[in-house]
Amino acid sequence: MPELIAIAYTEETVAAQAAAELDRCAAEIPLDPDAIGVIVAERNGSHQLLTSRHPGATAAWSRFWGVIFGVVMNEDEPSELDLSFRQQVKGLLRPGSSVLLVAVKRVTGETVLATVSQYGGKPLTCPLGAETTTGLWADPAG
């Protein structure tokens, strides 16, 4: 079953560094590079969602990240995403911090965590339902 991995960092630049490492290793893991997102909690209290779009990416990934950002930042929004997970991620987004988000299907969470272990961080995981992941992976097998 697909899942969403969130790794929280106390510094605002670390999640982007970990995302770059996952992007670099994406072919060997294997991980869809569009399945990586970062939320940065700016020091002024605003939040920013960072994603990268690779050649051949579908609009489904843009939609997915928009939904994830929306439900994490607005706990009252209905979602398949576990409320406790959403509250925990939002609670870890203190000014000057960041969270790496990775949607996985074929890759295990352990593989992702091992790839970015040098950055530390607090990991959380949450299963992703079919409604949330529709159209993300072209191959139904993953």
Spans of model-derived segments:
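Positively charged, small/polar-rich N-terminal and surface patches that mediate targeting and assembly
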Residues: M1-V99, A103-G142
